[in-house]
Structures are given as structure tokens and as C-alpha cells.
A protein has these predicted regions:
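A generic structural signal for tightly packed, nonpolar segments enriched in small/aliphatic residues
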Residues: 1-204
Length: 204
């Protein structure tokens, strides 16, 4: 959300040649008597049902509806980013964000743009087999799978809410906040994604 706010707060100063929508799926995340529980069945904006297997995997649920909404806007490309999975941090550490998507050209262009702007993106797979661990007996899918390949299973989950549009997902869990200085970044929030996405938009 902070990345999207950062981009949208300054992008008009650069007069981009393409139409840009910034979407933030903001909601309150708080325990209480009305909080969702394991075993609940949720219905997403596109009508797909989701069995809540793990309440800690809440970010992908809000992203799912945001992706559905974005695809309804008649856009050419959808790029989402989130501090989505600890599994991405395990895989790539704090040196690179994970990226995956349904269009090779879009993914490769984003990786190249990141490289030119001091960020590192590493492509992770979106193989159909990853969805096997998300299958549910009582809904279209579960919100989490096995502990293995967690970044990719989260990506495959999100892909189910993308329709008829080029899409890329960037998992910035490992690079959004640093516990100690690293390369040109100081300790703390890094603004991960802002430089890459802003420059990608301006290059269109």
C-alpha cells in the first residue's frame, strides 16, 4: 500500500503517457468475535469460494478482490506487490524480491527495469502443480497450501483472480524492511518497488 501511495503521490508530475490506476486493498486486521476462523468459507468478488485454512494468510484474500476489481477496469496490465510470504524471504533472503506472472514479456521487462534502478527481482515459477496443495473438498480452493513452495503457491492462488489481462505479482516480503543497512539502503523501510514501478510506467 505504501508503495502504491508513493507512486501515485508523484506520478502526475512526470506526465506518464499511459493511464494508471493505483488500488489499495485496505481493511482492518483485528481479533474479535466477528473475526474469521479456520474452516470458514469466503466468497471472492469473482464468485470463487475459499476455505480458510490459515487465518494468517489474510493478505492474499484482500489482494484477490483487488485483482478482480483491477481486471474489471479494462486495463492492459495489472501489477500487484505485497509483503506476502515468509517463504519468499526464506528463498531469496533480503537481497531480492520474488516476481511471477502470466506473461513472460511483462515479467522480464520488470526484472530489467528493477536492475536498472537499483533493485533486484528474481522470477519464481507458477506451475500448475502448485495448485494441488490448495485444493479443497468444500470450496474452490484453500487460502494456503503445504509449507513447501509457499511463495509460488501464493502466486498460483492470486492467479485464480486474474482474468484476460497480463499480470505480474511481486513479493517484497524480504526487501520492504531491513533490520540493518544493506547496499545503498539504511535500516528500516526501503520503499521497495517504488523506483522500479515508477520508471516502468514512465517507459511505456
Amino acid at each position: 500500500a505504501a508503495c502504491v501511495l508513493g507512486i501515485m503521490s508523484i506520478i502526475r508530475e512526470f506526465h506518464p503517457q499511459v493511464e494508471v490506476h493505483g488500488i489499495i486493498a485496505a481493511c482492518e486486521n483485528m481479533p474479535g468475535c466477528s473475526a474469521y476462523k479456520p474452516g470458514d468459507i469466503l466468497t471472492a468478488k469473482n464468485g470463487k469460494t475459499i476455505e480458510v485454512d490459515n487465518t494468517d494468510a489474510e493478505g492474499r484474500l484482500t489482494l484477490a478482490d483487488a485483482l478482480c476489481y483491477a481486471c474489471e477496469l479494462g486495463v492492459d496490465e495489472v501489477i500487484d506487490l505485497a509483503t506476502l510470504t515468509g517463504a519468499c524471504v526464506v528463498a531469496l533472503g533480503t537481497n531480492a524480491a520474488g516476481i511471477m506472472g502470466n506473461d513472460d514479456t511483462l515479467v522480464k521487462n520488470l526484472i530489467a527495469t528493477a536492475d536498472r534502478n537499483g533493485e533486484k527481482y528474481w522470477e519464481l515459477p507458477l506451475w500448475d502443480e502448485y495448485f494441488d496443495s490448495l485444493k479443497s473438498d468444500i470450496a474452490d480452493m484453500k487460502n494456503t497450501g503445504s509449507r513447501w513452495g509457499g511463495a509460488s503457491t501464493a502466486g498460483v492462488f492470486l492467479q485464480k483472480f486474474v482474468k484476460d489481462v497480463k499480470w505480474a505479482h511481486i513479493d517484497i516480503a524480504g526487501v520492504a524492511f531491513l533490520e540493518k543497512p544493506q547496499q545503498e539502503f539504511i535500516k528500516g523501510a526501503t520503499g521497495a518497488g517504488v523506483r522500479t514501478l515508477l520508471n516502468y510506467i514512465l517507459e511505456q
